[in-house]
Amino acid sequence: MDVNPTLLFLKVPVQNAISTTFPYTGDPPYSHGTGTGYTMDTVNRTHQYSEKGKWTTNTETGAPQLNPIDGPLPEDNEPSGYAQTDCVLEAMAFLEESHPGIFENSCLETMEIVQQTRVDKLTQGRQTYDWTLNRNQPAATALANTIEIFRSNGLTANESGRLIDFLKDVMESMDKEDMEITTHFQRKRRVRDNMTKKMVTQRTIGKKKQRLNKKSYLIRALTLNTMTKDAERGKLKRRAIATPGMQIRGFVYFVETLARSICEKLEQSGLPVGGNEKKAKLANVVRKMMTNSQDTELSFTITGDNTKWNENQNPRMFLAMITYITRNQPEWFRNVLSIAPIMFSNKMARLGKGYMFESKSMKLRTQIPAEMLANIDLKYFNELTKKKIEKIRPLLIDGTASLSPGMMMGMFNMLSTVLGVSILNLGQKRYTKTTYWWDGLQSSDDFALIVNAPNHEGIQAGVDRFYRTCKLVGINMSKKKSYINRTGTFEFTSFFYRYGFVANFSMELPSFGVSGINESADMSIGVTVIKNNMINNDLGPATAQMALQLFIKDYRYTYRCHRGDTQIQTRRSFELKKLWEQTRSKAGLLVSDGGPNLYNIRNLHIPEVCLKWELMDEDYQGRLCNPLNPFVSHKEIESVNNAVVMPAHGPAKSMEYDAVATTHSWIPKRNRSILNTSQRGILEDEQMYQKCCNLFEKFFPSSSYRRPVGISSMVEAMVSRARIDARIDFESGRIKKEEFAEIMKICSTIEELRRQK
C-alpha cells in the first residue's frame, strides 16, 4: 500500500515540521594543512575595512598600526570600522540612564572577583599560544612555562597564587630590557634503522637558553597564534581563529567578567545564559513588543546578520567603553581593565606554519615558514597568494603581522554584546522621539530587531535609523543577509521562533549514539542524551522509546555484547554465553556483559549499575565493583562526569552524566608511539603537572576552598592543611593516636626535604 506523505502532516502545526528539514548528515568538513592563507585574509580584510584611518608606528615594536577611530562617516553601504568615540560614549550613557546603577554594581561585583581569582583560572581553556616555545600548548603547560620563566627572571609576585599578582608580573616583564627563556630546538640526524636497515631521520629535542630583547619579548607577549576553525558547516571557505598567549589571557578574563556581569542585568542580552533560560528571556522581549502593537501598531522583526562583526570592532572603542563604565572606580581597577584593550590595539597575528611546496618532477617537498614570507621571491606563488603576500608585507615583523584594528574571533563576546545592546536600547520612544520604536535581542554578533510603528513607512524609517546608528559604532548590519517578517516568526542564535520557540529536535541528532569512551560512560551518556531531549526538545514518549531501542542496538553492535541467549556470533559471544549460563539472575547482567536491557523512558535517570544492583548475583557484584581488579586502570570517579556532545551546529556542549565506578569504566591506554619521540619530555611535564593539581585538589576539595593565604607554595599549603585536618580528625576520634603521629612525621619529613633542596 502506498502512503501519501502529506497525510503525515495533516494534524501537525507547520512549525513542528522543522525537524524534517535537517540538512546535516555526515561528518562536518575539517581543515588540513596550513592556516596561513586564512590568517592573511583576515589581516588584509580587517585593514581594508579601516583603510581610511590614520597610520602610526608603534615606538616599542616598530609595528605599523592603522587607527580608524573617528574616521570618515560612511557614505555608502560598504562595511566599515570607523566607530565614532562620542557616539559610543553616548550610547553607554543612555544605557546607564535606562538601567540606573548597572555599571556601578557590576564594577563592585567584578572588583570582588578580581581580588579572589586564583592564577589556576588560566589553566582552563584548550590550546594556548606558548610564547616561550613559539607554538601552541595545552593551557596548563603554557601557564607553567610562563611562571617558570618569570621566576627565573626575578618576577615573583605570582607566588601568592592570585591572578592579579601574576598580572603584575606580566606588566613588569614588559618593562624589562631583556628576558632569558628556555626554549626547545630540534636536531635531526640520519641514522640506520637496526630493524629495516634503511636510513631514517631521527629527531631529538634539546633545551637551550635564549635572551629575548625588549622588542622581541613584546612582540611575543602581544602575539595571537592562529588556527583554522574546524567542523564549520555550511561554508565553502574555512576561516582563521585566534589563540592568545598567557600575557593577554588574564586581562581578557577580567574584562569579560565585568561585561558578563553587565549582560546578566540586560534583558536584551542572549549571553551569558543558555538553553531554556535564554528562550524565556527572549520570549519576554517578543511578548512586550507584541502586546504593545496589538491595536494600532504594526510590528516587524528582522532576523539579523552583521557583516564581519569582529573585523569591524575596534579595541580602542572597547577602551573607551571601559573607561566610561569604570569612571568612578579606584585607579588600580581601571588600570587592570584597560590593559586588555590596549594590548589588543597593539596585537600581532602569527601567520601559522607557512606554505608547503612540492615539486612533482623531483618528488621534493619543502616548507616555507611564515618568517620567510617577508623577503621570498614571489614567482613561486599563484596569483591569488601573490596578491595576499604583497598586501601583507608592510605589516610583517618576524613572521607575525601587525593587526591593530579588529578583534579576532571569540575574544570579547560579552563586551561586544554590551555594545550591541546599547544600540537596541536607543530604540525606546523617549530616545527616537517619533512614532516608531524598536527593541531586540543581541548575542555576540547575532541579533534580532523588533520594530513597531503605526504604518509601513514608519517601520522602514525605524530600520533605517537603526542601521545608521549601528554604523556609527562600527556595527554593519548586512542588508543582503538580513530579512524582515511580521513579528512572530524569526530566528535568533539557531532558535526558531513561531508564536513561541520551536523545539528543533533534529539539531541534537548528531549527539545520539555511542560516544566511544568506555562501556560504562557510553551507556550513561546515551540514556542521558535521550532524557535531556525529552526535557528540553519536545522529544515525545514514543519517539524516545524508539530512540532508546535504537541506542541499545547500536551499543550492542559497538561493544559486541549481544544478549547471552542470542544466535549472533561475534568475537565476544563465546565468553558472554558462558557468563550467561553461569549466572542465576540473568536480569542482573549489564547490557555490556550480554544482559537484557531494563531501561525504559521512566527510569533513564538511574545509572544501569544501580538499576540492576538488587538483581545481580553476589559474585557478579563482587567482580563488577572491585577497585582491585588488576585488569582495569581506574579513573577516580566523581559522582558526576562531563561528556562533550556535538549538536549539529553551534559549539560542542558539555553535558553532565552520572558515573558509577565499575570494572567497565576503563581508560584506553595512551598511544605508545609518542613515548618514543622528542615530545616525551613535554608529555612527562604535563603528567607531573596533572598529578600535582589532582593532589592539591584532594587537599582542598572545592566545597572547602578557604584557600591558604600568604603561603608561598603548593607543598607548604598541603602540608599545613594536612596538619590541621589530622588534628581535627584526631580530636574528634576519627583517627587513632598512631595514625596522627605518622601523619605529623610525614609532614616534618617533607619540610626537611624542601629545606635541603
Curated annotation (Swiss-Prot):
Pfam families: Flu_PB1 (PF00602). It catalyses: RNA(n) + a ribonucleoside 5'-triphosphate = RNA(n+1) + diphosphate. One of its GO terms (cellular component) is host cell cytoplasm. GO terms for molecular function: nucleotide binding; RNA binding; RNA-directed RNA polymerase activity. Residues 55-64 have a biased composition (Polar residues). Keywords: Eukaryotic host gene expression shutoff by virus, Eukaryotic host transcription shutoff by virus, Host cytoplasm, Host gene expression shutoff by virus, Host nucleus, Host-virus interaction, Inhibition of host RNA polymerase II by virus, Nucleotide-binding, Nucleotidyltransferase, Phosphoprotein, RNA-directed RNA polymerase, Transferase, Viral RNA replication, Viral transcription. Residues 249-256 are annotated as: Promoter-binding site. Its EC number is 2.7.7.48. Belongs to the influenza viruses polymerase PB1 family. This is RNA-directed RNA polymerase catalytic subunit. It comes from Influenza A virus (strain A/Teal/China/2978.1/2002 H5N1 genotype W). The lineage of its organism: Viruses, Riboviria, Orthornavirae, Negarnaviricota, Polyploviricotina.
